[in-house]
Amino acid sequence: MNEKLSFMPSLTDAYVIGMKNVTSIVVAVILYVLTVWIPYINVGTTIAISNLPVELSKGKVISPLSIFDAKYRNVMGEYFLLQGVMAAGIGIGFAFLVIPAIVISISWSMAVYLLLDKKISWAQCLTESNKMTMGYKWKIFFLQLALAFVIFITLMIGTNIPYIGWLIVHIAVIVGLCAAVSLNAVIYRELQKNDEKPAAAE
């Protein structure tokens, strides 16, 4: 049985997916920024951007124009309710010296994807997300930390190189954005597999 979320394979897979969809992701983000001021439309596009990892997890090459699909606006009530509950729970976690907030945020990190992909209630999304991430929280944390570290180092190098540093920074931002979205896609895809979960301590 293949182990879920192995470190290097997951990062490599995220990079491959990100580069395969780099144009689509960048154009989708640009379209989102250009239209974010339009009332009502901006609700759907915000939800659509949140859904990018779900689409990427299915092996699709996404269409940037899909962020304008009406189906995303149809779930705005459940989406806002879910986000509000998550923000409240994580906020309370911060009041207990940060670490509980980090654990809760990872536990619920799949909830939005489940809402948009499986069309289940917001409360069930939180429960299912917690079940999915059980035993994998450390892996998720270190995968995201590793990606953030690589992006940070690249940006630091770019800002200290004369003449071409700005180009390195811009490339790092684009690649980092695509890799971050793609890493979430890999995590969501892997956690949906029906393999037996490890009994690792949280």
How does the language model describe each region?
Residues 194-202:
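Cytosolic juxtamembrane C-terminal amphipathic helix followed by a basic/polar low-complexity tail immediately after
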Residues 32-61, 90-123, 127, 160-195:
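Selective recognition of hydrophobic, aromatic-rich stretches within alpha-helical transmembrane segments
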Residues 2-34, 68-92, 104-155, 201-202:
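Interfacial aromatic "cap" segments that immediately flank transmembrane helices
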Residues 59-70:
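Membrane-helix interface linkers and caps
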Residues 14, 52-56, 67:
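A generic structured-segment signal
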